[in-house]
Amino acid sequence: MNAFDKIIGYDKIKTELMQISDMIHRPDAYAALGARMPKGLLLDGEPGLGKTLMAMALMEDSGLPCFTVRRCRSEEGFLKTLEETFGKAADAAPSMILLDDMDKFSSDEFSTAEFTAVQGCMDKVWDKPVFVIATVNDADTLPDSLLRCGRFDRQIIVHRPDTEDAEEIIRHYLERQVAAPDIAISDLAMLLVHSSCAELESALNEAAVYAAYDRSSTISAAHFIRAVLTTVHHVSPDISDADKEDQEASARHEAGHIAVMELLAPGSVAFATLCSKRPRDCSGFILRNSRLDMETNVMTLLAGKSACELHYGKVAIGCGDDLSKAAAQIRRRVETLGSNGILGVNVSGRYDGSDIGKMERETILRAELERYLFKTKELLAANRDLVQELADALLKKQTLLHSDIQSICGRYRAVPAT
């Protein structure tokens, strides 16, 4: 098994790591073309994405003597360990050093002694074949002098897995599990869209725990859904103690969100669910798998309120968060692009904090919000049957997977608002 095979997905990053390894194994071929081996590699990304695994795969494939430094001592003891490790690496050169969680080396955000020490150690081995790998959760917290070329020539941003990577990671873990045959990996990837690698692994393991406790021979969709909701989103799938009226209103609200997003950007809803955040509560949310343009995003945010008001004939409550988010998006749009012409656009480069300026922006914002609310209600009114079926399906199943939503929406031809 190749060392890089331990990295599931992330093909572009693997290619970059393999190129560095190739330079280590074939230095003469690169030197013949005047290429110099980079002095360092920085892997930057939030926790739980497998940065350390990637670094260790490169270290293993290189076949070089490798040394690792982690912050687990007092400042004085740590600085001594750092210097000793670089000294050992220099004596064993060609070699590699892994500075794991380097942004955690400093215990005080105002202290740079540890980072200065790293710079000094790297400069001391400048003329020796010592390759330094560092993993960080946020490179913005590091001094610019440490990140300059000549120290960390290569910087790789490690993002959360995209849908393809998530499917590959899920497929890898399911090789060790017994999933029900009707579970589609694509649906699981949509359930876990935007999740970190650690969250993927934790949710899949939790699903197996639930299945075993239920004395089930396979892991069902319900087990996976429960695991994702509790492990990743920290909500309960149990809404049985909530009032029926609350359940119906929540289903209607979420159905509005789904309908508008699918009508304006087909295939964008990853999954939708009804859940509970507190005892006797019923709420819900939908997750999207792609970016939306501003207008689609605003109308989707207003769709829950609009769907409930169309159905119940009264002002919907509990939609303040959606309204605030929609207003924030419209405000950014108005202040940078304008609404009609350049009305409201900041063309001077200076913020107008006067009462007149604030009143003008507020007037434009309210007018735009009302316009989008009316437009959203028109679209939902023209597609009432779709909203009704989505609401009924949510009440029945509580969670609609991506395939469920596509199956329902595929039976309807979108009716444009008049």
Each language-model region and where it sits:
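Walker A/P-loop NTP-binding motif of AAA+ ATPase domains
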Residues: 2-189
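An acidic site on a long C-lobe helix of protein kinase domains
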Residues: 9-13, 114, 196-200, 248-251, ...
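Residue-level signature of catalytic and energy-coupling elements of molecular machines
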Residues: 17, 42, 59, 118, ...
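Soluble catalytic regions of large protease machineries
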Residues: 46, 249-252, 258-418
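Ca2+-coordinating acidic residues in Ca2+-binding motifs
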Residues: 101, 223, 404
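Conserved C-terminal "switch" segment of AAA+ ATPases
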Residues: 131, 144, 159-225, 301-309, ...
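Terminal C-lobe "cap" of eukaryotic-type protein kinase domains
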Residues: 227-231
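Short pre-active-site segment immediately N-terminal to the catalytic Zn-binding motif
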Residues: 237-250
